């Protein structure tokens, strides 16, 4: 039996990396080194050790929660005398820009789909529900992209509601980081998966975050289990700048890239612009709209240098 680190009363159980890793409990690692390379983000050093010590215990925990949810559904069907319909289990992943949400989402998708039950696991990012650039420009919101007011929150809530209601076929808009915009006439089809992983800055936000567009139902109302990927802001800013520099040498060099003009910058100029973008946009959004949602999460992954998770907090 693994005991959590003793601390003052808190809604969370707290684990060191070593304690959390021990909860893997012989779950086999089904990903190869080559597959892990394909899953990691541009700015991360995702290792087999990280997957084994952090994500395998998490996938085991999620498997328990999902199995419990299925048993609850079976009890309800028995009570009602119905066969019922497949209701997807929704996992939400939130956190700052550059913290590694996408990598966490992709690793969990790969691991959860390989459990013996062979569950169907879909992944959708909330980026697709940003208003198109044409709308953001019209509303003078291009410099607030990722802030609550930049999302078509009603469409996002409608999408998640349909998925959670068991609608056989639901579509989600697709976002391209190359063109920095929603892709016109392109959609991702979601057809009653066993699990939907929803990843985005705004997954845990609620009414107080949308004063500009008051409504009564939010994405978080439909999420069964939520994860917040956390790190000190000094690290987040550093990771953001490093990622910007890598994009400058890679994706930004594509003539079709929205940020192609940044590819001509010197390293010093690129660092200055990335620092400015962080302080004016991403850092502000973190402090005002993202970090305040952290304590709403079911589980918090606390990262240190090199994107390594060093502590885990699990809601009691």
From Swiss-Prot:
Q: Name one GO cellular component term.
A: cytoplasm
Give the metabolic or biological pathway.
Answer: Cofactor biosynthesis; coenzyme A biosynthesis; CoA from (R)-pantothenate: step 1/5
Q: Name one GO molecular function term.
A: pantothenate kinase activity
Return the HAMAP family for the record. Pantothen_kinase_1
Coiled-coil segments, which residues?
none
Ordered alphabetically, the record's keywords are: ATP-binding, Coenzyme A biosynthesis, Cytoplasm, Kinase, Nucleotide-binding, Transferase
* Name of the protein in its database record: Pantothenate kinase
Annotated catalysed reactions: (R)-pantothenate + ATP = (R)-4'-phosphopantothenate + ADP + H(+)
- What family does the entry list? Belongs to the prokaryotic pantothenate kinase family.
Provide the gene name from the record.
coaA
Q: Which InterPro entries match?
A: P-loop_NTPase, PanK, PRK/URK
Q: What class of enzyme is it?
A: transferase
Q: Which organism is it from?
A: Sodalis glossinidius (strain morsitans)
Q: Where found, per UniProt?
A: Cytoplasm
**Could you tell me the Gene Ontology terms of the biological process aspect for this record?**
coenzyme A biosynthetic process
List positions binding ATP: 95-102
What's its EC? 2.7.1.33
């Amino acid at each position: 039996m693994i005991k959590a680190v003793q601390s003052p009363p808190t809604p969370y159980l707290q684990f060191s990396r070593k304690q959390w890793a021990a909860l893997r409990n012989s779950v086999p690692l089904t990903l190869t080194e080559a597959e892990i390379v394909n899953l990691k983000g541009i700015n991360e050093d995702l290792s087999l050790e990280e997957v084994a010590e952090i994500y395998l215990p998490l996938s085991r925990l999620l498997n328990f929660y999902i199995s419990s949810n299925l048993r609850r559904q079976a009890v309800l069907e028995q009570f009602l005398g119905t066969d019922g319909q497949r209701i997807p289990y929704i996992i939400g992943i939130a956190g700052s820009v550059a913290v590694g949400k996408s990598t966490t989402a992709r690793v969990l998708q790969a691991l959860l789909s390989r459990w013996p039950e062979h569950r169907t696991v879909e992944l959708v990012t909330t980026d697709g529900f940003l208003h198109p650039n044409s709308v953001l420009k019209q509303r003078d919101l291009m410099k607030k992209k990722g802030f609550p007011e930049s999302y078509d929150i009603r469409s996002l809530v409608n999408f998640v509601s349909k998925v959670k209601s068991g609608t056989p076929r639901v579509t989600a808009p697709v976002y391209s980081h190359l063109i920095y915009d929603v892709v016109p006439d392109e959609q991702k089809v979601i057809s009653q998966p066993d699990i939907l992983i929803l990843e985005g800055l705004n997954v845990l936000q609620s009414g107080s975050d949308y004063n500009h567009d008051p409504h009564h139902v939010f994405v978080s109302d439909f999420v069964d289990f939520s994860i917040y990927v956390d790190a000190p802001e000094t690290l987040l800013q550093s990771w953001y700048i490093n990622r910007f520099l890598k994009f400058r040498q890679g994706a930004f060099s594509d003539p079709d890239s929205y940020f192609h003009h940044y590819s001509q910058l010197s390293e010093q100029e690129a660092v200055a612009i990335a620092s400015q973008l962080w302080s004016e946009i991403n850092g502000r959004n973190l402090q005002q709209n993202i970090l305040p949602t952290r304590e709403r999460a079911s589980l918090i992954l606390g990262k240190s240098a090199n994107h390594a998770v060093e502590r885990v907090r699990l809601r009691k």
